[in-house]
Amino acid sequence: MDFPIRSQARLYPAQCVTFCLYVRVPPLSEWNFLKMQTDARPSATWPSVPKVHKRNRSTSLSDQQTAKKAHANHARLHLPQPIEPVYESQNGSVSQSEEKSSAVEINNSAAGDPQRFAVADLNFSWAEEEEKVVLAPYDYVASNSGKEFRTLILNAFNAWFRVPPESLTIICDVVRMLHTSSLLIDDIQDNSLLRRGRPVAHSIYGVAQTINTGNYVYFLAAKELNKLRNAASALEVFTAEMLNLHRGQGQELYWRDTLKCPTEDEYLKMVSNKTGGLFRMAVKLMQAESPAGPMAPVCDKLVQLLGLVYQIADDYKNLTAVEYTTSKGFCEDLTEGKFSFPVVHSIQSRPEDRRLYQILAQKTTEVEVKKYAVSYIESTGSLEYTKQVVRVLVQRARDELSRIDQGRERNQEMHALLGKMALE
């Protein structure tokens, strides 16, 4: 049977609205049944407020509001109050009231006693698990290693330097750490999407964490140098070449962001600082650790040539090689807006034509637009010109290699590496 209950609600100062609230009052038989159930099972819940299973200790705001309204309505209508819902947790069943008091206790416990700071040991140690968190972006890239070309070059140079194995291992590790950590930063600065065929680290770990990790590993590498026999000299070399690396990177970013095309010589100087810096650092560290000491061969010119060949050949492959499309994306240098060696030559060949400027400014990801850019670069003879430059530099490096080797052809590893770098 339904009974209307009249009430008045004041909605506006000058207006009252009368409304009817209809409540269904159960028949006497149902009341007796419910009373028997609640007497027999005091833990039973009111039918309209079901028991909740597998909940966390913290209840949501909506659950608390619903429970309060249910209690208020039953009290106003003189109905039996529903049993407070019970929530199951890992520590057993708890009610909402117990939940609140427990939460207060937890908060008070978390706050703790301020006096503990008077005697507490505040000398914290760095845990291995914490180190893993900070190094996660680096480990992600390092786990997908590349060609290890720099390690091959160091092994080839060691035919002359004869660096002790333990020192050579440290130098190779330092070079690998610096190269990998620089990739973390480069990918952010270039807005890259892929690195070695996988999503770039900052797309997974975030930009801020990836930058922090890249910088952190720079200092870890410097710390490793303290293990070398000539640690003081090694740190001087490290500092000088890291400065050169950042100078070269700064130049390249400036040209890209201001859409200023460098001259060929400006480009070569940038490459000498950016790419050649890491090669020079490695070779100078090996010279410092070599048992030959001052009698060790001077390889500065060869290292310089290797850095130029490596970068210019890389620029060429980025626009032409299929494997680069798989690992980095199709013509990624064009998407980055980069003034690579073929692009610089193409623009200078036709300075009045602004088409390449416009394409670089857009940082386009459209494949057809990039295909058109490559065909334009090819039409200016820039791809063939780049191949010829690499060929000349490789031959010059071979001549320098023969000079260092004094015609004895001892360093066959270096000859083999130069053969791989040539664009034949």
Curated annotation (Swiss-Prot):
Its EC number is 2.5.1.1, 2.5.1.29, 2.5.1.10. Its cofactor is Mg(2+). It catalyses: isopentenyl diphosphate + dimethylallyl diphosphate = (2E)-geranyl diphosphate + diphosphate; isopentenyl diphosphate + (2E)-geranyl diphosphate = (2E,6E)-farnesyl diphosphate + diphosphate; isopentenyl diphosphate + (2E,6E)-farnesyl diphosphate = (2E,6E,10E)-geranylgeranyl diphosphate + diphosphate. Coiled coil: none annotated. Mg(2+) 1 binds at D186, D190. The record marks Y218 as: Important for determining product chain length. Residues 58-67 have a biased composition (Polar residues). Isopentenyl diphosphate binds at K147, R150, H179, R196. GO terms for biological process: alcohol biosynthetic process; farnesyl diphosphate biosynthetic process; geranyl diphosphate biosynthetic process; geranylgeranyl diphosphate biosynthetic process; mycotoxin biosynthetic process. Dimethylallyl diphosphate binds at R195, K274, T275, Q311, K328, K338. Residues 42-73 are annotated as: Disordered. GO terms for cellular component: cytoplasm. It is found in: Cytoplasm. Binds 2 Mg(2+) ions per subunit. One of its GO terms (molecular function) is geranylgeranyl diphosphate synthase activity. PANTHER family: GERANYLGERANYL PYROPHOSPHATE SYNTHASE. Catalyzes the trans-addition of the 3 molecules of isopentenyl diphosphate (IPP) onto dimethylallyl diphosphate (DMAPP) to form geranylgeranyl pyrophosphate (GGDP). Belongs to the FPP/GGPP synthase family. This is Geranylgeranyl pyrophosphate synthase D.
